[in-house]
Regions:
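Short coil/turn segments at the loop-to-beta-strand junctions that recur within blades
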Residues: 45-48, 85-89, 144-149, 203-204, ...
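Surface-exposed loop/edge segments in extracytoplasmic proteins
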Residues: 77-80, 324, 422-427
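Hydrophobic beta-strand positions
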Residues: 70-71, 189, 416
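Beta-propeller domain segments
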Residues: 23-28, 93-95, 103-105, 171-327, ...
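Acidic, Gly/Ser/Thr-rich repeat motifs that build Ca2+-stabilized beta-propeller blades
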Residues: 21-174, 225-232, 280-319, 347-357, ...
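C-terminal outer-membrane/trafficking sorting elements
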Residues: 382-392, 396-462
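Bacterial Sec-dependent N-terminal signal peptides
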Residues: 1-22
């Protein structure tokens, strides 16, 4: 573990500031008054499917053929960690989604989803361990998921309560999306050891939400809401707010409930409608949330990579995160876009997918593109604000005290959200007040987030 801690410390010193060398600009485009510069971080990749910004301030990447690598965001150097021998690539199938354990220094686990052959084509969730610059010690947490060469879903997200969400596609078996006993066409929720959480919507069932066709984007925003992007069939692609036990309508409903048959089904089954759609479909893939001052025009927005659409879509959100504004489309000169992540410095990294058999690749493909405001200079006020809010004691049992860095100039609201993003308590600092004591009476033991304008902190209630 000493090696891993040293690696992360060294990366922290390099990864969040200026890039070691400025790559040539490939193009620029405006976002409001900001000029966003596009450059190539690294080239010659083979279908980068997932990009994850790690706690070591490196980009962790899967490529569909089975390789997992770390990418230096300063130099673009790609360091392979493992090539999984049992990955079975076929059409859209292969090595797909990945997520890192949030406590990576003490739990150096990497979770991946991929297709494999075992008396048929299947999908599985595997945990790997990072040690001495390599990945190994695979543990299958969930296997035997029916699959075909398309519609595997496969995005992963770890929630603050340390449960894992995993999207699955319908594997071209349309009725499976409404069948709660099938793992297909769902967003599954598991513990990090692969067991089923006791508080899942249906006891003993991994299904968290259902009625999905092929969700391939998944992100939790700072508002606590979970968003997923989903491939439609022909009419509409979607962005949905994911809620426990919710039905998203497939295969009867595609996109909005705006046809007669859809409306009847939606009413009878309390179907959740998307907050944003593309019509016609654009092949929406990776999804991330952006709220950094480096590009002010993108703050509080979802950014979605599209394959058939060959563009990046900005989806602005309202303050509550429940309503989406009109989409803005950029980055239209680089072909199919699949993977996306954001660094703490406000740079956006986008992976192209032009070697996936559905495009004519250029000499540089596939590549990771960097989108950045090169004129942005971080200051103390634009750095992460999470450290400005203090909580004690933590863990807490009966009460918790909140301390602001300075007295509130106006009344300031405090929100406590549970691990699923639900608001469970609200309080308020009065103008001139800097310290506030909150009763935790009635809140169950677990992990919560405390949010104010001064930042967000994690709270453990015992």
């Amino acid at each position: 573990m000493k090696h891993l801690n040293s690696l992360i410390l060294g990366s922290l010193l390099l990864g969040t500031g200026a890039r070691a060398q400025t790559a040539p600009a490939l193009t620029t485009f405006p976002v409001g008054a900001t000029t966003v510069t596009v450059s190539a971080l690294t080239t010659g990749l083979q279908v980068p499917w997932e990009l994850v910004w790690g706690t070591d301030n490196f980009i962790w990447m899967t490529e569909r053929g089975g390789r997992i690598s770390r990418v230096d965001p300063n130099s673009g150097q790609v360091t392979p960690l493992i090539t999984l021998p049992d990955v079975a690539t076929s059409s859209e199938g292969g090595l797909l989604g990945m997520v890192l354990h949030p406590d990576f220094t003490t739990s150096p686990y990497v979770y991946v989803v991929y297709n494999y052959n075992d008396t048929g084509y299947k999908e599985k969730l595997v945990r790997l361990t990072y040690a001495n610059g390599t990945l190994g010690s695979p543990v299958v947490l969930l296997g035997d998921i029916p699959a075909v060469s398309t519609h595997s879903g496969s995005r992963l997200l770890i929630l603050p309560d340390r449960t894992l969400l995993m999207t699955t596609g319908d594997a071209q078996d349309r009725p499976s999306a409404q069948n709660r006993s099938s793992p297909n066409g769902k967003i599954l929720r598991l513990n990090l050891d692969g067991t089923i959480p006791t508080d899942n919507p249906v006891a003993g069932n991994r299904s968290y939400s259902f009625g999905h066709r092929n969700p391939q984007g998944l992100v939790r925003a700072s508002n606590g809401r979970i968003y997923s992007s989903e491939h439609g069939e022909n009419a509409e692609d979607e962005v949905n707010i994911i809620e426990a036990n919710a039905n998203y309508g497939w295969p009867t409903v595609e996109g909005l409930c705006n046809l007669a048959a859809e409306q009847a089904f939606c009413t009878a089954n309390n179907v959740r409608q998307p907050i944003f759609t593309w019509a016609p479909t654009v092949g929406v893939a990776g999804l991330t949330y952006y709220d950094h001052p480096a590009i002010p025009g993108w703050r509080n927005s979802l950014l979605a990579a599209t394959l058939r659409g060959n563009k990046l879509t900005q989806i602005p959100l309202d303050a509550a995160g429940t309503t989406a504004g009109t989409g803005a489309f950029t980055l239209t000169s680089f072909g199919r876009l699949r993977a996306i992540c954001v660094s703490p410095a406000g740079r956006v990294y986008v992976g192209t997918s032009n070697r996936d058999g559905r495009a004519t690749p250029g000499t540089s493909d596939d590549q990771i593109l960097v989108l950045e405001n090169r004129a942005f200079v971080p200051t103390a006020t634009t750095a992460s604000r999470s450290s400005q809010l203090r909580l004690w004691p933590n863990p807490a049992s009966r009460t918790v005290t909140l301390q602001l860095p300075n007295p509130a100039t106006t009344a300031a609201t405090v929100h406590i959200h549970d691990a699923l993003g639900r608001a469970v308590r609200t309080a308020q600092f009065a103008a001139g007040q800097s310290s506030l004591s909150l009763s935790l009476h009635g809140l169950q033991p677990g992990l919560y987030s405390v949010k104010t304008a001064a930042g967000t902190q994690r709270l453990v209630i015992e």
